[in-house]
Amino acid sequence: MTDKRKDGSGKLLYCSFCGKSQHEVRKLIAGPSVYICDECVDLCNDIIREEIKEVAPHRERSALPTPHEIRTHLDDYVIGQEQAKKVLAVAVYNHYKRLRNGDTSNGVELGKSNILLIGPTGSGKTLLAETLARLLDVPFTMADATTLTEAGYVGEDVENIIQKLLQKCDYDVQKAQRGIVYIDEIDKISRKSDNPSITRDVSGEGVQQALLKLIEGTVAAVPPQGGRKHPQQEFLQVDTSKILFICGGAFAGLDKVIANRVETGSGIGFGATVKAKSDKASEGELLSQVEPEDLIKFGLIPEFIGRLPVVATLNELSEEALIQILKEPKNALTKQYQALFNLEGVDLEFRDEALDAIARKAMARKTGARGLRSIVEAALLDTMYDLPSMEDVEKVVIDESVIAGQSKPLLIYGKPEAQASGE
């Protein structure tokens, strides 16, 4: 490579592509009887980048999985919730099929189908959304509805959700517009009462109003990377009609609202149908019968419900399902800890009785699958603290008494290397 110098013969060197001399450019790279300047290198890089961007959408077009394939992938990571998986698979497939065909099919405009997930804490709402985004290889971001407020009040603006999505894909607007946004705790922004109040409800109904346009589809103006809003700044224009919004919440108490509606038909007096306690539907069965009117009574405004036409309900996980979650998914919790111990050269074994005890403890805490990690972490804490300083440990065994806190994990030692080689 030459840097503004003549070659051995004293001749002035020129770029073979743009014809500029070595004095007009910063660097001149020499090959066998050919030269290229730094400006031409940059230009070539830009051309290649543009071509890659043009090719990428065509790859995405051919890679859209079918609802059956989406469901199968969800089965690898999420235990149970079969109906919710089916609803999600169809909704996600239709959403991305709509994007591929430019929002229309034979002149018919295709509507946007955002999704509402209703289910108790730890039932897999967030995991389902994350797994979908990973399968489709699209940007994914999560937002907490409880931190959102109307514009102009202390708290996060709803536009901040789109900024987070842009950050996940290095401010590539085209990528962001194919992304998935999961808004958690959506039930916490329900209207505080049925009667309009004199004071503004800036974190309840106010946030629902602010989210309406964003979820339905608008062009959101977002400041570019790392910039605060000021008049001289050019804003990025993001079309949210192409972004899939999934809202999730536990909706504690919604089952009672549904029960009141369902049981109203039983009547009173001599002709009333008397229901025994055993006839009462479970919470999961009631949630599966949810109607828009129930969500309105719960505190969501009709316009907001209208923007979430696809509703999927998740059941509370049983003890058997929690045991499956511990050992069956590809990234099951026991597999994660076994991989962690393998990095120390140690095998980790969970006996079946230990898995039963972990599941029972999580059921008692009513935290669903979310509480499993804290239980396992507490049981293994001392071992993970001591293990890096110990030698010749080959295996760690966890049984029921360890989970109950009655004993320490069983450590199985191998023979010291020196002794083994001597024999």
From Swiss-Prot:
Coiled coil: none annotated. ATP binds at residues 120-127. Gene3D superfamilies: 1.10.8.60, ClpX chaperone, C4-type zinc finger domain (6.20.220.10), P-loop containing nucleotide triphosphate hydrolases (3.40.50.300). GO terms for biological process: cell division; proteolysis involved in protein catabolic process. ATP-dependent specificity component of the Clp protease. It directs the protease to specific substrates. Can perform chaperone functions in the absence of ClpP. The lineage of its organism: Bacteria, Pseudomonadati, Pseudomonadota, Gammaproteobacteria, Enterobacterales. Residues 2-56 form the ClpX-type ZB domain. Keywords: ATP-binding, Chaperone, Metal-binding, Nucleotide-binding, Zinc. It comes from the Bacteria. One of its GO terms (molecular function) is ATP hydrolysis activity. The gene is clpX. This is ATP-dependent Clp protease ATP-binding subunit ClpX. It comes from Salmonella typhimurium (strain LT2 / SGSC1412 / ATCC 700720).
